[in-house]
């Protein structure tokens, strides 16, 4: 993987990731949003449909794909790309977040995490080394280190111990990744909760180990938005400017805008797909809750400004009807629209940075959705931009 920082506009960054894959070179224009394909599928969508929304790269889930279908069947197909027939780049998370979300079903030790398989009930062990091996078999273009996702709230002492163990696991991840002679990219994950001094140590030590990109983890786990913004404003300037920056598990459209305002290049979230299945649709001027009875007789398109298959062909009344009847097509059409909305938003962001008018775009975006622009404390990046 190669990363090229092409342009900055304030703290917003315009770049390009280049991946060499068996079917040729693939480019990912950044800032980019990655749809989530937890089990090797973006729910309800074919790979062609996902690509038609403008998605350039997908996220797969190491933990879930390890439990089902397992490494052996993946190897028999070739890798995850062959298994799911998506031939563009794939980023896989390390399984850390899923393990830690198991709560009482898991036990964290220095060597790794012991937990109960939520499917079969058997005892299973996942370590940094094992995560690297699974992601190697998945053929992930971007591999994430195995870390502990520090919960919120967490005391300073707990966050410190957690961050320090994540650093030790980062080194073990790096070592095993190198032993496997994996030709793909490995990203470090910055932890430290809401504590700036812990985040500082985490970034410095990860940069010492050396990674192809750096993710900000442990945010969007229940902390106030102000804390997320503060940590991003603190951390982003400390990440080497020539490496991509990835904000994990975020988020709402305004979270993407706020992340870019603070220097983030990559995002992923289940929100557009999960919300679509629940009739919660993102449109140019905010939200449409298609289950609301007021849409029963609404023969207008979902979003007149959207060019997706759903908006070009169907009315709100039809989407309301499909949802009321529990038709699978309703969830599919909603998903097509929400994913296209997210990709259109990212394309608008990239164009605004290209044209040196990102600040104006931010104002326009918040005016459209009827919200105030959140304050930005961060000075323009200088020392390592």
UniProtKB/Swiss-Prot annotation:
Keyword Amino-acid biosynthesis set for record: no
Needed co-factor(s): Zn(2+)
Active site positions, chain numbering: 93, 268
Molecular functions (GO terms): metal ion binding; tRNA-guanosine(34) queuine transglycosylase activity
InterPro entries hit by this protein: ArchSynthase1/Queuine_TRR, TGT, TGT-like_sf, tRNA_ribo_trans-like
Keywords: Glycosyltransferase, Metal-binding, Queuosine biosynthesis, Transferase, tRNA processing, Zinc
Superkingdom: Bacteria
Substrates-to-products reaction catalysed: 7-aminomethyl-7-carbaguanine + guanosine(34) in tRNA = 7-aminomethyl-7-carbaguanosine(34) in tRNA + guanine
Pfam family, one: TGT
Pathway: tRNA modification; tRNA-queuosine biosynthesis
Cofactor note: Binds 1 zinc ion per subunit.
EC number, as in UniProt: 2.4.2.29
Family label: Belongs to the queuine tRNA-ribosyltransferase family.
Function: Catalyzes the base-exchange of a guanine (G) residue with the queuine precursor 7-aminomethyl-7-deazaguanine (PreQ1) at position 34 (anticodon wobble position) in tRNAs with GU(N) anticodons (tRNA-Asp, -Asn, -His and -Tyr). Catalysis occurs through a double-displacement mechanism. The nucleophile active site attacks the C1' of nucleotide 34 to detach the guanine base from the RNA, forming a covalent enzyme-RNA intermediate. The proton acceptor active site deprotonates the incoming PreQ1, allowing a nucleophilic attack on the C1' of the ribose to form the product.
Description of how the protein assembles with itself and partners: Homodimer. Within each dimer, one monomer is responsible for RNA recognition and catalysis, while the other monomer binds to the replacement base PreQ1.
Name of the protein in question: Queuine tRNA-ribosyltransferase
Organism field: Glaesserella parasuis serovar 5 (strain SH0165) (Haemophilus parasuis)
Gene coding for it: tgt
């Amino acid at each position: 993987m190669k990363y090229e920082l092409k342009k900055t506009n304030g703290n917003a960054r315009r770049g390009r990731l280049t991946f060499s894959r068996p079917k040729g070179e693939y480019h990912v224009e950044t800032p980019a949003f990655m749809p989530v394909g937890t089990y090797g599928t973006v729910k309800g969508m074919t790979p062609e449909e996902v690509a038609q929304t403008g998605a350039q790269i997908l996220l797969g889930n190491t933990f879930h794909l390890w439990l089902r279908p397992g490494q052996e069947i993946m190897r028999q197909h070739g890798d995850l790309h062959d298994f799911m027939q998506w031939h563009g780049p794939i980023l896989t998370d390390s399984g850390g977040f899923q393990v830690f979300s198991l709560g009482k079903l898991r036990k964290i030790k220095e060597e790794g995490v012991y937990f109960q398989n939520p499917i079969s009930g058997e005892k299973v062990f996942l370590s940094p080394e094992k995560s690297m091996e699974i992601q190697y078999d998945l053929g992930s273009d971007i591999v994430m280190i195995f870390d502990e996702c520090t919960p919120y709230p967490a005391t300073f002492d707990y966050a410190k111990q957690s961050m320090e163990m994540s650093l030790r696991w980062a080194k073990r991840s790096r070592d095993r990744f190198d032993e496997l002679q994996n030709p793909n990219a490995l990203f470090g994950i910055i932890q430290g909760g809401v504590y700036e001094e812990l985040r500082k140590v985490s970034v410095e030590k990860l940069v010492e180990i050396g990674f192809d990109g750096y993710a900000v983890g442990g945010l969007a786990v229940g902390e106030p938005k102000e804390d997320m913004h503060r940590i991003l404003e603190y951390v982003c300037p400390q990440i080497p400017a020539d490496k991509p920056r990835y904000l994990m598990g975020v988020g709402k459209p305004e979270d993407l805008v706020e992340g870019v305002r603070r220097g983030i290049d990559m995002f992923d979230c289940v929100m557009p797909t999960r919300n679509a299945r629940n009739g919660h649709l993102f449109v140019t001027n905010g939200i449409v809750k298609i289950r609301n009875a007021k849409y029963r007789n609404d023969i207008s398109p979902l979003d007149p400004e959207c060019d997706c298959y759903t908006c070009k062909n169907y009315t709100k009344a039809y989407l309301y009807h499909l949802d009321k009847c529990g038709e699978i097509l309703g969830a599919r059409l909603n998903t097509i629209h929400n994913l296209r909305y997210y990709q259109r938003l990212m394309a608008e962001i990239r164009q605004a940075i290209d044209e040196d008018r990102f600040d104006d775009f931010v104002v326009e975006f918040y005016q459209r959705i009827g919200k105030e622009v959140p304050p930005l404390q961060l000075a323009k990046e200088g020392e390592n931009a």
